[in-house]
Design a protein with these regions (language model features):
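Conserved CoA-thioester-binding segment of acyl-CoA-metabolizing enzymes
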Residues: 1-53, 93, 331, 343
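Glycine-rich beta-to-alpha active-site loop
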Residues: 95-139, 161-167, 171
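Loop-centered beta-sheet repeat module
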Residues: 154-199
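Gly/Pro- and small hydrophobic-enriched strand-loop and loop-to-helix capping segments
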Residues: 121-144, 176-192
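Glycine- (often His-adjacent) and acidic-residue-rich active-site loop
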Residues: 54-87, 140, 332
Length: 343
């Protein structure tokens, strides 16, 4: 069975991720097939909108399939990882810039690479079990697939909070943070998809939507804004009272697990992208970091600890946020000239 099902259904171009046992993680082949569909449907007059969903109950897409990246990277070959990211980011840009309405149905986990497929459209639908996150700093990477732009656009300093903690958002949080648009009960999704395919009218989404659930992050926003406005990790940590209220104690607990270098770089890129507010600029800056993440960063060690050995005890390059010098951040952020990202 194919990992992805691409077809026309009435007035809709449909993309269904079909690797439920792997939480619909994106393979390199899936990335290329999604890009080809976007290219084909962009100017097709018989396609009015896109509908993107996934099989299974546990996840829309829990990220990228990074097994081969780890195997090639630990052998000293970084070309495959760079190629994967270049082609994935090009697809992400085409998704964000697609000239027709894109409707995505985000059940269960939507993380990392799943955000790049599911969260750049104009009609992003969540339900009661939706959980959305940019968890990259937990594996030594930075928020990518255009996620840095979504974080930069989040209210107040919520983008910094989500990018540095890798905290998970429920449906209400995702809508508040700008990663989703509509809350629609899961049991009504088949009827909504049928209506979208029959009519090609994205207005059906708004008519099916229910009020958004209360957002924990909205309640926490004042404390988050007070602590996550600093220019550096040190500034942010110094702004956190100890002991602090629940939001700050929760943030400190999450950040203690993450790569100090990845967090420092994530903070830098969110601030840089906020000034540009452009998907291609975001992806180009993300690629500067990811292209170097295996050789100079913590990505391979993060994958080893989380996925390969599963010991959850990564040995990061820096012992703490206090130990990340500015020079190490600068070394990750220059343009990539030997294998540049091209759109």
């Amino acid at each position: 069975m194919s990992d992805i099902h691409i077809r026309q259904d009435g007035r809709a171009g449909r993309i269904t991720l079909s690797r439920p046992k792997a939480l619909n993680a994106l393979t390199y082949d899936m990335v290329l097939k999604i890009e080809a569909a976007l290219d084909q449907w962009r100017a097709d007059p018989t396609i009015d909108l896109l509908v993107i969903d996934a099989e299974g109950d546990k996840a829309f897409c829990a990220g990228g399939d990074i097994q081969e990246m780890y195997e090639t990277g630990t052998a000293g070959n970084y070309d495959y990882g760079r190629k994967f990211w270049r082609d994935e980011y090009r697809m992400n840009a085409k998704m964000a810039e697609f000239p027709k309405p894109v409707v995505t149905f985000l059940q269960g986990f939507t993380m990392g690479g799943g955000v790049g497929v599911g969260c750049h459209g104009a009609h992003r639908i969540v339900c009661a079990d939706s959980r959305i996150a940019m968890p990259e700093v937990g594996i030594g990477l930075i928020p990518d697939v255009g996620g840095s732009l979504l974080l930069a656009r989040a209210p107040g300093r919520l983008g910094e909070y989500l990018g540095l903690t890798a905290d998970r958002m429920d449906a209400g949080d995702a809508i508040h943070a700008g990663f989703a648009d509509h809350f629609v009960p899961r049991e009504t999704w088949p009827a909504l998809i049928a209506a979208l395919c029959d009519t090609g009218d994205p207005g059906a989404v708004g008519r099916a939507a229910h009020p958004a659930p209360r957002s924990r992050l909205a309640d926490w926003q004042p404390q988050i804004d007070a602590c996550f406005g600093g220019d550096t990790l040190a500034d942010i940590h110094h702004a956190m009272p100890d002991p602090g209220p629940e939001p700050i104690a929760h943030a400190q607990k999450l950040m203690a697990r993450n790569s100090p270098l990845a967090m420092a770089c994530a903070l830098r890129i969110i601030r840089t992208v906020r000034g540009a507010d452009d998907i291609r600029t975001a992806l180009e800056h993300e690629y500067r970091y990811t292209a170097r993440s295996m050789e100079r960063g913590d990505f391979l060690e993060g994958i080893r600890a989380a996925i390969i050995d599963k010991d959850r005890s990564p040995k990061w390059r820096h012992a703490s946020w206090r130990a990340v010098p500015e020079a190490d951040i600068v070394a990750m952020e220059g343009p990539v000239t030997d294998a540049p990202l091209q759109f």
